[in-house]
Amino acid sequence: MFFKWISKFIRRLSKCGIKSITSKAYK
């Protein structure tokens, strides 16, 4: 259960990180 929560948190963080990185690169 704890591992699943961590994977979910990492997925959310990676998604936000990718979005911010792409926006910065294009800008």
Curated annotation (Swiss-Prot):
It comes from the Eukaryota. GO terms for cellular component: chloroplast. Its main location: plastid. Keywords: Chloroplast, Plastid. It is found in: Plastid, Chloroplast. This is Uncharacterized 3.3 kDa protein in psbT-psbN intergenic region. It comes from Marchantia polymorpha.
